[in-house]
Amino acid sequence: IGCVEELDKAFNWAEKYGLQILIDLHTAPEGQNGFDNGGICGVCKWSKNPEEVEFVLTVLERLAKRYGKRKGLWGIEVLNEPITESVWELFDVPNRYPAVDKEMAAGSGPNTLAFLRIFYQEAYDRIRKYMPKEKYVVIHDGFVLTAWKDFMREEKYVDVVLDTHQYLMMAEAAGCEQTIEGYTCFVKEHYEKEIEEMEKYFPVICGEWCLFNSLACGCDTKGGQSVLNGVDGAKEERLTLDEKNEIYRAVADAQLQAWQKGSGYFYWSYKLLTDTVNENGWLGWDSWDLGRCVDFKWFPTQKKN
């Protein structure tokens, strides 16, 4: 497992300072989503190759064996963002994330929910061999949050958490109006309602979210695309600080209220390495950085009475 020594260090730090770790297997050979975060843009063939599926299962076993009884372990997430048909089409993945190696990308396509169900069940069995029941096995919803109501209902499945990733850029791609009212209504009607509904079946965490949105960027980002996708961003500030603050505080409050219907949430990410001041096309992308959001007072740091 690459860089496993660094993960060893992370556990030592976590246990020293009273933190807990959710290990997330973020990529799979031949890609599980075709996104840039899947390791190979435009390539999504992992689930079609039984040998690679088995390899991922053995990696999960090794992780569970190495860290399953560590005090600092909260749980293991089986796989990050395995894409299914709806988001594959919504994002038009082959064009949004064009493959460098066209031959390698040939035959790429979304994973099926039927495959993910079988894979998750096998992964659970492999992980639980080495991990106590009080540690969590986390499964991603494949971007279809309400599709799992009848899944893992048997008594053998203990402490399974359902992870959903909800970004306003995805709401925009789905047709959400790029206004404060548009965002807050979408969050309430979709994120909040669906999380509350699914909490009846699993503990639900929003494993990725942020304040990023096109309105605060001052331009339509086409669902969160950037200069890396060939979409030019704003070249100069189009909003005042007060206007930005109003937008970000409104979407922060709406989203935090939605996540309260579930069992937890993780902001993505704590730190953004992109220089939004000196690099062209990145105005408005500070909101991916939680530290900057707190510094700029976009993110509430105290609960309201």
Can you describe what each PLM-predicted range is?
Residues 1-28, 37-77, 124-126:
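An active-site-proximal structural segment forming one wall of the substrate-binding cleft
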Residues 4, 28-31, 63, 67, ...:
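A structure-centric feature marking long, well-folded core domains of fungal metabolic enzymes
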Residues 22-26, 77-79, 138-140, 163-165, ...:
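A cross-family glycoside hydrolase active-site/sugar-binding cleft signature
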Residues 29-48, 91-98, 221-226, 287, ...:
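Aromatic- and acidic-residue-enriched segments that line the glycan-binding/catalytic groove
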Residues 72, 84-253:
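Extracellular glycoside hydrolase catalytic/binding regions
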Residues 234-305:
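Aromatic-rich peripheral "rim/lid" segments of glycoside hydrolase catalytic domains that contact
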